[in-house]
Amino acid sequence: MCTLVILRRPGHDWPLLLAANRDEIRHRPAEPPARHWPDRPAVVAGLDRTGGGSWLGMNDQVVVAAIMNRTGSLGPAPGKRSRGELVLEALDHTEAKSAAGALADLDPNAYRPFNLLVADTIDAYWLRHGGDGEIRVHTIPPGLHMLSDTELDDSGHPRIRSYLQRFRSAEIPDPQHDHWQAWQDLLASRTYSAEADPTAAMNLEERPDGFGTVSSALIAVPAYPGFASLPRWLHAEGPPDRFPFEPIDLKG
């Protein structure tokens, strides 16, 4: 049950900010974000060694893509392709709009259900495959939103119900000055309301089966990417209350 926080600010110097916690079985092998694919030299992404794809990535044209399993679809299944491939396929495109259009035409029956974010400085889309034989594309409006394993801003989802308003009320990061503290604190939070279960925490304690929060990310995309204004990506290679956020080298 990975979770994304998406802040869209059209017209701002930093129109796209993302925060993400990756929840996974801890023993599933993975590598931190880097240029892992020789046939895709423009892509920086985390590497899932089991499936060969990724859960979160960015290309040199600052298209960002992230994949989340939908409820009840954790892990691989016989006869299904890895959903991590979709992140890489999205990052083959130079614009989020063209990526969303191309991925919407894929055969949904080849994959287990997913939520896929594709965004850039201009547009942001949520591609929803709910297991009903169709991939639906939804535009994500300006403002702050959360997406996990159900619907965008789903008030019935324990984590979104617990944290959406907290993120909306928190101090907005200032990537220009590397100030992310409010969002870092929320990503690291293990608190949840008394009436909720532990999965409502933003940062999940590891369960007996090894499932929990295994890494965390903060991403900022500038309006005019270039040598003088590079995107920012901070990565915690473990639960963010125990591992520091370190910058990812995005230079080609």
Predicted regions and their residues:
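N-terminal nucleophile
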Residues: 1-252
